[in-house]
Amino acid sequence: PWPGWLFYASTQVNSRNSIFRDIPVLNNYITRCQSILQEGKPYNDVLLYWPVFDLWMEGGQEELRFRVHHPDWIEKSTCGKVAHWMIDNGYTFDFISDNQLMDTRFDHESLVTEGNTVYQTLLIPSAKYMNHHTLQHIIHLAEQGATVLFLDNLPVDVPGWHDFKLRKGKMVASLEKLSFDENHTAQAGKGRIIIGKGLNRLFDLANIIQEPMLDEGLLFIRRKSQECVYYFIANQTSRNIDKWIALNTPGRSAVVMDPMTGWTGLINSREKDEQIEVYLQLEPGETRILRIYPEKTINGDYWPVLGTVSEVIPLTGTWQVDFVEGGPELPQGTIMDMLKCWTRLSDERALRFAGAARYTIDVDLPVMKQTVRWILDLGDVRESARITVNNQPVGVLVAHPFRIDVSDYIRNGENEITVEVTNLSANRIRDLDIQGVGWKKFYDANIVTQMYDPFDASSWDLKPSGLLGPVAIIPYPLKHFGAQ
């Protein structure tokens, strides 16, 4: 019987989960993202030293476990706070350990790791303890030409008690060779070692430039291949992005991809101060992948840029609602003049239903113009939606924003729009626990809460389900640029 034998993993990706019918869309999104994010090499500026000896020497009496539920060992450390600050301020970095640092060299004006990944500088975040071999190698990198940044202080001690005096003496001898001026900078061979209290000042001295898009609240991952630079960009703000965005990389042309749909096209770009700017439209919840070509001009079709909306066509009227798939029983179909959560229907079967309902409405549209893109906006959807227009499948939406281009499917006059909405299985699980059904029966690895307490969904609130709207069709004029 449903839901079958379930392991206590956080997500049940199997055919008994109602949302499983639309999981392929999510899988395709992940595939497209990973295909890019696993290509090439990291393209970050800073190597951030992980001062593990500070953690071990000052860790307290309890075990320091690497667990997702207890991240304080890094979140509350100086290194963790520095990492968060760098992310929030648009500075790119990768962590590096002592062993990895020992395999790092300076070559062609850059720090180069064992994997031949290139960085501009090394940052040591307030480390008190350091292996003397590591310190000696850091000084050697500076002597070869590297710029090394120490936040707040140089290390003052070596970890552990084995040969303590010998190792401490070697550390002191290495540090005494450094002579710092009034700007807390020491020349070391061809390079520099700089001590500073503020990260902004340190990065300015090392000529490390932040990504300007962080000023707009955009998050990003940057990669580099032999031919181009990749940006994965996410808008996790509540604001629409509709403007020129500067990137901290040179470029002659750029291509954009929506990893949710796979659509690609040239993106409008221009060069400014030896860097590239792109015209980016990104709604809250959306992601894009940019491919920047530093020296190559790419030809092709441009990604459509939507102009200013002059009217919105609300889809008001009568919605025919039919429950088409799921359980434990299909609720009775109904007619809605106003969209609402299906748990508010008078049919009690809807309270425990997990599955899909089909919403259908007829709408008359005005004469279409060639320069207009028609966007169907579903408003609030709980939780995924399959869209069909005039009996033609358009696409599946599984995340915000629940909007889709229907320009190629609608026609002048009357159109039939169908939206199949699938909810989560939570309400059905809730009902099983209310009834006391013994569905948790996996031997020795049963369903538990996040903190490994007995799992009980009987006190859960009903989860909103269905198409909540408001639903509208929006005709957007296209914005044209001189390069197109």
What are these regions (language model features)?
Residues 268-271, 394-398:
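Short beta-strand segments within Ig-like beta-sandwich modules, predominantly Fibronectin type-III
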Residues 1-356, 364-368, 472-483:
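Carbohydrate-binding surfaces of carbohydrate-active enzymes
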Residues 246, 352, 363-390, 397, ...:
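Aromatic-lined ligand-binding clefts that engage carbohydrates, nucleic acids, or primary amines
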Residues 277-280, 403-409:
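Exposed aromatic-hydrophobic patches
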Residues 287-288, 374, 411-437:
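Short, well-structured beta-strand segments enriched in hydrophobic/aromatic residues
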